[in-house]
């Protein structure tokens, strides 16, 4: 359970569910659309707090913002993991290339020595 799923502002009608609606939305909507949904709710609650529910709306805005930060942090962590994987793969390829080059150099040297030995045997 993520930190933002461990509580709810303004009741517990979502927190009591096995799957919270925003988790289902995240799974179905895709990253960009879900981030937009969270961003939109931040704007909604911030815009209406003076006219409707005051502090509670500010707390809801804060809750949606915390969820948006979780989502964006997860994206950044995933991007960093991908970069690390790619860097590791590139290093491995460079290592294989270097080892292949060494093997090729060794074989060429061996072939030269063998050719000289063969000439001396004639």
Per-range role (PLM):
Residues 1-122:
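Intrinsically disordered, low-complexity regulatory regions
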